[in-house]
């Protein structure tokens, strides 16, 4: 009896501590277009209308108790013994005593850089270790996921010694094992039930991944359950726990790439308790007393409908987190570095630029981006003084560009840029699309400084400037799920001739675009489109393809005409002008669509392509189909997305020809392209 009373007394003391720690936080509720946040009775619950997530206050912090798909009514969370979703070994764990100082709910759009959402910020103080944590949740109305993040600040008495931010490898009985480091989020998913785990990541340094042996996408599916020992994956940006055709997606909003971990991006630890996401992106010595500093965020997303539904849910959430702005981002860009052999600075000469402007206007390209060489001093990573080298500054170039309806873009070695110079260029030109190159982001301070600069520039000329962030080379930069609100991500340098390993090979390019479209939004990827008739023949079969075929590879993306229009022959102009014109008529729909790879993986002998599912009109979209050069079948059966059992009304955007096609109950439809190395761009409407 004494033992029982002692346990009751301890429970009462613990409960009183919880209430005391929660005492200053008043019950509150707020809604936004169907999204809802509720704080009450020591619980935090958020709902987008599609997904809900619930936490309980444990005295150590917020611990997830529910993750629910509101469409299927399926609950994914299980009971665990964990007391807090975040952790810093050596400082914060389940036994830490936290004080919930406040919980604030507000509407936000992140200063215009994200979609409207409810933001919930809970501030938890840990006086014993001299730390304060802000637990941040972004709740987007109608989205299939929520975003969580930890921010950290030092309080009096904080000492960085003893904290372990990184995942530690250790040896035990001949084995190399890992201990999880700083934890950013935890999902109590039941991995004892039938499930598989799908991991994916995208490589850094895309310019050196052109050939068929180096796909941009790394994907691994692990089967077998229960998961008894922790499954540790350090290279991936995303994990999907698949329970048959439904499941949960977890994404690191970080600078991680498969071959470049960047700053403390951690990994996924999946085991008996659930899925643990590590990597604060903040070293113990970077925790400071004057402000909260952000850690890498995490997306938790629910889905149904198998891998197609998984891709759709991921891209829907990505579009909420990183919306596109067609008035800012939808254009056909050209870049003067395209004919580089291997250098391209000579194509920034004023004479070349003045000749290029009317040539671009003739075929319908809208933005001329002047690459490395326009600035007054240096080149490459040593470039500086980013003001025009030209005799009359921008006066003559701007006058000719205005005459032909061409806007301008500029290359910049972003680490060396003076913000006032960038602003001056924007003010004089009226619009600038920047290519941000040669970055190197080694620590949290580097990321904070660069992001602050991007925001300053974009706010200076709202919707009149944007950045394409370049991940070329192997330096730690941005990854693929971070910093996309400032424009797009530059893809691969692809050249006519030099250096040889960058030579344009059509099926290589199409293949990488196809891989990227699986888990990355196509309207955030700027792709290079080279001149097939000028490409060297000893390393490529590009010359056996038409200009239209090669340009069409970029239609689902942000197309960059990586060549000079003044070098086009008459046949090239005749081929490109009608294609570009047809594309522009439907661009508003294409650019805002959700894109999926369809058909077979490009191999130079496949039926392959892309399906662009309209976000503007249900049941409609576009198909871009390729019959590759060595494919001997004029008719191809292509697996489509979300159209099983439908009849499609088709319109050929180039010819205006109309037709219909029946989609089987399994989602397949047959198309015809009579000649190899040809393509079709079709608008569809499902009946």
Give, region by region, the residue ranges found by the protein language model.
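N-terminal secretory signal peptides that target proteins for export/translocation
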Residues: 1-6
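Bacterial N-terminal signal peptides
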Residues: 9-20
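N-terminal carbohydrate-binding accessory modules
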Residues: 34, 301-328
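Short Pro-Gly-centered flexible turn/kink motifs
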Residues: 148, 284-306, 677-685
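Hydrophobic, well-ordered secondary-structure scaffolds
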Residues: 418-484
């Amino acid at each position: 009896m004494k033992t029982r009373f002692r346990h009751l007394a301890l429970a009462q003391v613990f409960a009183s501590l919880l209430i005391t720690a929660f005492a200053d936080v008043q019950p509150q509720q707020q809604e936004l277009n169907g999204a809802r946040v509720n704080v009450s009775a020591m619980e935090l619950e958020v709902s987008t209308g599609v997904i809900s997530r619930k936490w309980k206050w444990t005295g150590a912090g917020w611990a997830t108790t529910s993750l629910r798909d509101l469409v299927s009514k399926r609950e994914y969370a299980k009971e665990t013994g964990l007391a807090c979703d975040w952790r810093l070994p050596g400082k914060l764990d389940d036994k830490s005593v936290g004080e919930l100082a406040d919980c604030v709910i507000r509407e936000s759009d992140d200063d215009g850089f994200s979609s409207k959402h409810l933001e919930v910020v809970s501030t938890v103080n840990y006086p014993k270790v001299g730390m304060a944590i802000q637990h941040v949740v972004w709740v987007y109305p109608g989205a299939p996921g929520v975003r969580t993040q930890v921010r950290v600040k030092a309080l009096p008495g904080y000492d960085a010694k003893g904290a372990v931010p990184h995942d530690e490898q250790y040896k035990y009985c001949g084995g190399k094992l890992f201990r999880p480091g700083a934890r950013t989020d935890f999902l109590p998913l039941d991995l004892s039930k039938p499930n598989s785990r799908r991991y994916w990541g995208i490589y850094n340094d895309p310019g050196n991944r052109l050939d068929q042996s180096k796909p941009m996408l790394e994907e691994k599916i692990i089967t077998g359950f229960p998961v008894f020992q922790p499954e540790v994956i350090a290279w991936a940006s995303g994990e999907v726990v698949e329970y048959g055709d439904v499941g949960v997606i977890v994404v690191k909003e970080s600078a991680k790439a498969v071959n470049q971990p960047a700053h403390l991006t951690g990994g996924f630890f999946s085991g008996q308790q659930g899925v643990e996401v590590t990597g604060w992106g903040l070293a113990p010595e970077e925790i400071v007393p004057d402000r909260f500093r952000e850690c890498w965020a995490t997306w938790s997303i629910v889905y149904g409908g198998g891998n197609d539904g998984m891709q759709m849910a991921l891209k829907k959430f990505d579009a909420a987190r990183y919306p596109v702005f067609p008035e800012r981002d939808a254009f056909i860009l050209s870049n003067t570095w395209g004919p580089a052999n291997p250098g391209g600075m000579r194509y920034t000469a004023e004479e070349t630029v003045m000749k290029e402007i009317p040539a671009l206007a003739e075929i319908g390209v809208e933005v001329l981006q002047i690459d490395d060489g326009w600035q007054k001093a240096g080149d490459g990573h040593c470039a500086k003084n980013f003001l025009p080298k030209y005799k009359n500054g921008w006066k003559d170039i701007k006058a000719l560009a205005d005459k032909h309806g061409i806007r301008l873009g500029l290359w910049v070695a972003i680490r060396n840029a003076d913000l006032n110079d960038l602003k001056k260029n924007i003010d004089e030109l009226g619009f600038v699309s920047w290519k941000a190159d040669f970055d190197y982001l080694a620590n949290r301070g580097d990321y904070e400084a660069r992001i602050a600069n991007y925001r300053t520039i974009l706010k200076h000329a709202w919707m009149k400037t944007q950045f394409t962030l370049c991940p070329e080379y192997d330096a730690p930069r941005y990854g693929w799920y971070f910093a996309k609100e400032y424009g797009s991500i530059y893809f691969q340098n692809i050249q006519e001739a030099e250096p040889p390993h960058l030579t344009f090979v059509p099926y290589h390019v199409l293949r990488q675009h196809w891989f990227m479209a699986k888990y990355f939004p196509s309207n955030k990827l700027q792709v290079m489109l080279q001149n097939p008739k000028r490409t060297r023949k000893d390393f490529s079969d590009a010359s056996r393809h038409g200009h239209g075929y090669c340009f069409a590879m970029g239609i689902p993306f942000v197309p960059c005409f990586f060549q000079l229009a003044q070098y086009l022959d008459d046949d090239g102009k005749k081929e490109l002008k009608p294609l570009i014109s047809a594309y522009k008529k439907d661009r508003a729909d294409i650019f805002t669509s959700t894109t999926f790879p369809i058909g077979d993986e490009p191999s130079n002998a496949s039926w392959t392509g892309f399906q662009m599912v309209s976000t503007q009109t249900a049941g409609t979209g576009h198909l871009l189909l390729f019959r590759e050069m060595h494919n001997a079948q004029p008719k191809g059966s292509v697996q489509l997305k979300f159209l099983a059992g439908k009849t499609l009304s088709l319109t050929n955007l180039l010819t205006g020809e109309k037709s219909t096609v029946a989609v089987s109950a399994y989602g397949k439809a047959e198309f015809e392209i009579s000649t190899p190395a040809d393509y079709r761009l079709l608008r569809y409407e499902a009946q």
